């Protein structure tokens, strides 16, 4: 007699923590970046502020962008965030800027721009000119350069409180949401470059590795040199020949 097959029950992924604090008066500006370690192209930085009402943002499919196995589900999550977050914002720095300033400086500047834009957008959405004490930056990682914002209520610059959370994209919903927006924006940028310049896929496999130092990418650099969009200050790009693509 044939043994009946067991039906697999898919385990529901537990929701990430919605907020870092329990302060309902505080707007948490959560941030993450994508492409920090890439050898090609831009680094993207994103911020997300969630609505206080959980019914407006369930967070059911929100997780660390690296945990998605389906590109379709990743993009669906990104669209959900854009439609349902209180506010969101994306910034980037290109390869030349990264080489001139260094990657850490570019990420910090991008995060500062995200905070500035997020405060402006929250004020617009709520139709209230909040003072800086109503905002806090929640940053993925272990380092953040403090940011000061002009407060019209005090007529001077006030430092925005912040915390850093290592592996925060696996702990907090809004940081995970920011990681999703940053990753999808960067992936789209690389794929658009590959469509415009097919040689990027042919020589470096960028349509697959999106700029990370995979075997195919490294082999392409060793054989063909680097393009004007590679980061000249990263790894083997420092000594590689530059070949301009037109």
Protein language model features and the residues they cover:
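RNase H-like, Mg2+-dependent phosphodiesterase core
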Residues: 1-246
């Amino acid at each position: 007699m044939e043994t009946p097959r067991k039906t697999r029950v898919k385990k529901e992924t537990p929701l990430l923590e919605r907020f870092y604090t329990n302060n309902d008066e505080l707007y948490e500006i959560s941030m993450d970046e994508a492409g920090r370690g890439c050898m090609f192209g831009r680094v993207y930085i994103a911020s997300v502020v969630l609505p206080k009402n959980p019914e407006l943002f369930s967070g059911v499919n929100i997780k660390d962008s690296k945990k998605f196995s389906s590109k379709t589900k990743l993009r669906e999550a990104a669209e959900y965030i854009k439609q349902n977050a209180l506010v969101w914002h994306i910034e980037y720095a290109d390869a030349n800027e990264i080489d001139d300033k260094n990657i850490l400086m570019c990420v910090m500047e991008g995060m500062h721009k995200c905070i500035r834009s997020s405060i402006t957008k929250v004020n617009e959405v709520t139709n209230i000119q909040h003072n800086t004490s109503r905002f806090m930056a929640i940053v993925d990682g272990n380092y953040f350069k403090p940011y000061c914002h002009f407060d019209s209520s005090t007529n001077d610059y006030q430092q925005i409180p912040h915390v850093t959370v290592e592996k925060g994209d696996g702990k907090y919903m809004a940081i995970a949401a920011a990681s999703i927006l940053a990753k999808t924006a960067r992936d789209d940028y690389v794929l658009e470059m590959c469509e415009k310049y097919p040689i990027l896929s042919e020589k470096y496999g960028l349509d697959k590795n999106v700029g990370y130092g995979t075997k195919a990418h490294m082999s392409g650099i060793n054989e063909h040199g680097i393009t004007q969009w590679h980061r000249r200050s990263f790894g083997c790009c420092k000594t590689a020949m530059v070949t301009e693509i037109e």
